Amino acid sequence: VSAKFATSGQDCLAANRFYIERPIYDAFVEAFTEKVRALSVGPGLEDPDIGPLINARAVAKQEEHVADALKQGARLLCGGTRADIGANFFPPTVLADVPCDALVFREETFGPIAAFSPFDSADDVLQQANDTETGLVAYLHTQSPARIAQFTRLLEFGMVAVNRTKITGAPIPFGGTKQAGLGREGSRMGMEEFTNVKYVCGDTH
């Protein structure tokens, strides 16, 4: 839940697409939705779980993504319409059975929408996960060492978090692939971005 709804989803590291293995899909989505329904929405001074979005355009984007997903056959499990406590508030929203070509799967939502889809095989979910123009971070949750090795090798993302949701810090080479930026911030690699490389060739005779 925190991987999606921290900072109301307005975070480049926020999980956009949730792929859950089919045998546990229904139970997982139900448990996830129950926790999301318990999240509070309100002004920041009231210490809510979900605060306002940055502007009206951000709220309109949430509405567009929800409407598009529902039009394509997704199920709305909670949220989905702007909150009545203020113009820029949108409640935490869960969508299930989202098709791969829905806007919420094709664009970065930057808002409190969690979109779910089931998968049947490793090849299936890897193809879907990598089918994106951006590749900043992927979150992998599994108890299988073999699957960890397979997915961390084949996921086309600059960072992969395994069985955790926090992946920031000064020692980390923060950055992505594809349209998620060039170079790295943080770590030795990040420092090298601010240096000039000089090659000297010669001898002392």
What are these regions (language model features)?
Residues 37, 66, 82, 89-205:
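Conserved C-terminal structural/oligomerization subdomain of aldehyde/semialdehyde dehydrogenase
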